């Protein structure tokens, strides 16, 4: 889809579908302007549809003239409550109403209260991402028409300075959605590694994959313990973006890569949603999606390392037992008191490996705890870090992306819950504060001198019903936040 600005007036626009945002109680002037397009039928149509401009309301009017042939009005609510995310939601509604149109979609929104460039990028991303549909596994997908061009009406040319980032970023989100949505018999650890290799080949990145024997040589006992219950080989992925010219910052992204999580001998039952545990590699999807975007955007001065310890957590005669002791690659011994707390074990060795790269900052993303979902729900991810500048940078990046992120406490006193009578640590603490003790467990495997942040995306990785610009299913959460954060370091 081509994206461009249309600085001229609404009356001179001649596309196929016109979407206009309307404030509640402030519609009269705009409706009078639109009335000429509808040849007197607009007010009557809106009365029938009971459109008042409330947030989330939508009305459609078929026009008798050739261009445009469909008018879409989307309610924005009260003008004083206007935020960038309201534009995203309105644009997503308008885009979905344009399905069936293969021509030009025009959007007229109240740009002025907000930064024009930020608003243009937010709306363009919302349109592309809301039109996404995964048809890879359909035997006979139905034909589907979407707009081939998006014109943002009433914006000056200067507002287009960030539009070049839209398609690379959205392509990264769509890759993440595809990876998360793929069933576990399709997206195996080997398939995830192949995705990274293909990204490297197509986008000028570097990629290395460590096999089981390589990981054993590095004494990654925690990671390999999780993998030993599966017939599928683990794959430890290291993908690297190197900028042209001198490197000023070296950043590392670590993504949890459990392509399926049965829970192990602490088998997932009841409300544990074992049928959805294909999405337990959502962290790896986010960091690979971000790598895909960064490879095309090519920020200067920033080197980015993407690390994924991919495997399955399954049950067989070789699977790790509850109560087993393992040794991580930094020498820390761990008592596994719950085999369903496996993600932190794989991340432990991944974080130790990443520290060896001497990065200036590490950010890990993981579908780690149900406790985070209980605390923050399905629209906000949790952020744990002891480094204020890193927290501020990630929070600002998430806000600009429209992805919910909330900083959570990391009190050292909660580490008491991880003490073991046999080993240095247990892999789970008491049920209260479970997301905090999970973050504290990970902290044990990060060198104190390296700024580190942990983002728990257990609630945000998947949307059962769909919301805003996210379809039902995989959301691709985290890609846009990571891309914004990395580019801000350039």
From Swiss-Prot:
Cofactor(s) needed for function: Mn(2+)
Places the protein is found: Cytoplasm
InterPro entries: Leucine_aapep/pepB, Macro_dom-like, Peptidase_M17_C, Peptidase_M17_leu_NH2_pept, Peptidase_M17_N
One Gene Ontology term, aspect cellular component: cytoplasm
Matches recorded under SUPFAM superfamilies: Macro domain-like, Zn-dependent exopeptidases
Active-site residues, Swiss-Prot/TrEMBL: 268, 344
Gene Ontology molecular function, alphabetical: manganese ion binding; metalloaminopeptidase activity
Gene3D superfamilies referenced in this protein's UniProt entry, alphabetically: Leucine Aminopeptidase, subunit E, domain 1 (3.40.220.10), Zn peptidases (3.40.630.10)
PROSITE patterns assigned to the protein according to its UniProt record, in alphabetical order: CYTOSOL_AP
GO biological process, one term: proteolysis
Entry EC no(s): 3.4.11.1, 3.4.11.10
Record family assignment: Belongs to the peptidase M17 family.
Physiological role: Presumably involved in the processing and regular turnover of intracellular proteins. Catalyzes the removal of unsubstituted N-terminal amino acids from various peptides.
Name recorded for this polypeptide: Probable cytosol aminopeptidase
Organism (species): Prochlorococcus marinus (strain MIT 9313)
Gene from which the chain derives: pepA
């Amino acid at each position: 889809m081509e994206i461009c600005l249309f600085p001229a007036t609404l009356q001179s626009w001649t596309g196929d579908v016109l979407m206009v945002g309307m404030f509640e109680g402030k519609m009269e002037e705009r409706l009078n302007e639109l009335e000429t397009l509808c040849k007197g039928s607009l007010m009557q149509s809106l009365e029938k549809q009971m459109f008042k401009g409330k947030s989330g309301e939508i009305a459609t009017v078929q026009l008798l003239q050739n261009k445009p042939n469909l008018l879409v009005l989307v309610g924005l609510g009260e003008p004083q409550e206007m935020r960038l995310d309201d534009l995203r939601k309105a644009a997503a509604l308008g885009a979905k109403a344009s399905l069936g149109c293969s021509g030009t979609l025009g959007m007229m929104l109240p740009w002025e209260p907000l930064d024009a460039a930020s608003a243009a990028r937010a709306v363009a991303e919302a349109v592309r991402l809301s039109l996404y549909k995964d048809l890879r596994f359909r035997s006979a997908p139905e034909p589907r028409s979407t707009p081939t061009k998006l014109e943002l009406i009433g914006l000056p040319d200067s507002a287009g300075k960030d539009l070049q980032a839209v398609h690379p970023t959205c392509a990264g989100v769509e890759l993440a959605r595809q990876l998360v949505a793929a069933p576990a018999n399709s997206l195996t650890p080997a398939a995830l590694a192949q995705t990274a290799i293909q990204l490297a080949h197509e986008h000028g990145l570097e990629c290395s994959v460590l096999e089981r024997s390589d990981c054993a040589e590095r004494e990654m006992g925690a990671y390999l313990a999780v993998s030993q219950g599966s017939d599928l080989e683990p794959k430890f992925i290291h993908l690297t973006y190197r900028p042209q010219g001198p490197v000023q910052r070296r950043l590392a992204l670590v993504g949890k890569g459990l392509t399926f999580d049965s829970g192990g001998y602490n088998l997932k039952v009841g409300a544990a949603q074992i049928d959805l545990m294909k999405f337990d590699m959502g962290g790896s999807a986010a960091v690979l999606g971000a790598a895909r975007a960064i490879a095309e955007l090519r920020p200067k001065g920033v080197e980015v390392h993407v690390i994924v310890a991919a495997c399955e957590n399954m049950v067989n005669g070789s699977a790790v037992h509850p109560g087993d002791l393992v040794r991580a690659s930094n020498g820390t011994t761990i008592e596994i008191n719950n085999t369903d707390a496996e993600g932190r074990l794989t991340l432990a060795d991944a974080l130790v490996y990443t520290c060896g790269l001497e990065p200036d900052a590490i950010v890990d993303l993981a579908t780690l705890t149900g406790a985070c979902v209980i605390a923050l729900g399905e629209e906000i991810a949790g952020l744990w870090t002891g480094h204020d500048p890193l927290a501020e940078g990630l929070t600002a990046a998430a806000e600009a992306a429209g992805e919910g992120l909330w900083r959570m406490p990391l009190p050292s006193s909660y580490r008491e819950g991880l003490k073991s009578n046999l080993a240095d640590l247990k892999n789970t603490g008491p049920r209260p504060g479970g997301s905090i003790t999970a973050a504290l467990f990970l902290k044990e495997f990060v060198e104190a001198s390296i700024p580190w942040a942990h983002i728990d995306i257990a609630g945000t990785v998947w949307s059962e019903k769909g919301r805003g610009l996210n379809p039902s299913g995989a959301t691709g959460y985290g890609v846009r936040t990571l891309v914004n954060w990395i580019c801000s370091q350039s």
